Amino acid sequence: MYSMQRVYDYQGQQPAILTDRLWPRGVRKNKLNGVQWCKTISPSTSLRQWFHQDRQQRYSEFCRRYRLELQQPEQLQQLENIRQLHHQYGQLLLLTASKDIAHSHVPILLAALQH
């Protein structure tokens, strides 16, 4: 089972990966000891910056563009690596610093992992 959670709420009890390209502000590295940082699976810098200019109006297009990015060879390999971690642990928590997880890249990533 995959789950999503804000990194700020993570207590360190479940296997987890950090899905953000940027390290979460105010989080010490030792708080995420044992958590893999999979920054290459996150949206590209240009896509992230474009999306953040108008999140409400651009979310649908952001989803479409991010799905295309996830089809690139490096991202496909990273998806497979994450699936292997999930298989190894039986569960995996997808962590993000996003305040609005439902309208972030994480649900798109989750759908790609379950595909």
Question: Each predicted region: which residue ranges?
Answer:
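Residues lining hydrophobic/aromatic ligand-binding pockets adjacent to catalytic sites
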Residues: 1-115
